[in-house]
């Protein structure tokens, strides 16, 4: 296999990652499909950027995106139309800038106490978890789901019912046999 035809063959950290600076849309079919979008006045060359290109270039792209976007225009060359925003957010290459900034801010100011962690964390019940006793078995099995565990419990309950009925039947059989022997002995001696 000739590796020179692959994109980014001279950077092993970027191996087989998308390196597309711009894609020229020259097809009349693609131009016609762009007209259907709201605000369909797209330029002939649309620029696509891969947000997950490499760790060090990620911040540069985000800074360019912040500088390049304006609050007045709803649709720019860098942002998708409003109808595509839900599709973009489901895309694994989509990076929300507010989440990334919040994560960087949390890394700059770490929480050293439980109260601070509860204030700044998404998981606000850390103090409740610390009150639980790890020696208690329910602490370890609390939220765990084992596939087939409910079926196993039903099977054990069915076996317990079956053994209970068997014991009752055996006790009833013993009582009846004792009564029969007592009646036969009494009839012999009378």
From Swiss-Prot:
GO CC terms, sorted: endoplasmic reticulum; endoplasmic reticulum membrane; lysosomal membrane; stereocilium
InterPro entries (alphabetical): MINAR1-like (IPR039706), MINAR1-like_C (IPR009626)
Membrane topology field: Single-pass membrane protein
UniProt-annotated glycosylation sites, renumbered to this chain: 109, 125
Protein's UniProt keywords contain Manganese: no
Transmembrane segments: 169-189
Tissue: Highly expressed in the auditory hair cells.
Location of this chain's protein in the cell: Lysosome membrane; Endoplasmic reticulum membrane
A single BP term in Gene Ontology: exploration behavior
Pfam families linked to this entry: MINAR1_C
Gene Ontology molecular function terms on file: cholesterol binding
Keywords: Deafness, Disease variant, Endoplasmic reticulum, Glycoprotein, Lysosome, Membrane, Non-syndromic deafness, Phosphoprotein, Transmembrane, Transmembrane helix
Keyword Transmembrane helix set for record: yes
Superkingdom to which the source organism belongs: Eukaryota
Role played: Binds cholesterol and may regulate the distribution and homeostasis of cholesterol in hair cells. May play a role in angiogenesis.
Subunit annotation: Interacts with NOTCH2.
Disease listed for this protein: Deafness, autosomal recessive, 120: A form of non-syndromic deafness characterized by congenital or prelingual onset of severe to profound sensorineural hearing loss. Sensorineural hearing loss results from damage to the neural receptors of the inner ear, the nerve pathways to the brain, or the area of the brain that receives sound information.
Family, as annotated: Belongs to the MINAR family.
Record-given protein name: Major intrinsically disordered NOTCH2-binding receptor 1-like
Gene: MINAR2
């Amino acid at each position: 296999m000739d590796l020179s035809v692959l994109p980014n063959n001279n950077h092993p950290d970027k191996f087989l990652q998308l390196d597309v600076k711009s894609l020229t849309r020259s097809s009349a079919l693609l131009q016609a499909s762009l007209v259907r979008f709201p605000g369909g006045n797209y330029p002939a060359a649309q620029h696509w950027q891969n947000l997950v290109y490499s760790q060090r270039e990620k911040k540069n792209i985000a800074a360019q995106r912040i500088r390049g976007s304006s609050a007045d225009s709803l649709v720019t060359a860098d942002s998708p139309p409003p109808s595509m925003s839900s599709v973009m957010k489901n895309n694994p290459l989509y990076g929300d800038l507010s989440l990334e900034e919040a994560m960087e801010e949390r890394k700059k100011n770490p929480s050293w106490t439980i109260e601070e962690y509860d204030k700044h964390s998404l998981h606000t019940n850390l103090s409740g978890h610390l009150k639980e006793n790890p020696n208690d078995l329910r602490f370890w099995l609390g939220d765990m789901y084992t596939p087939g565990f409910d079926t196993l419990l039903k099977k054990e309950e069915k076996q317990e019912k079956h053994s209970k009925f068997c014991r009752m039947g055996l006790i009833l059989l013993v009582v009846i046999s004792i009564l029969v022997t007592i009646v036969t002995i009494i009839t012999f001696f009378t």
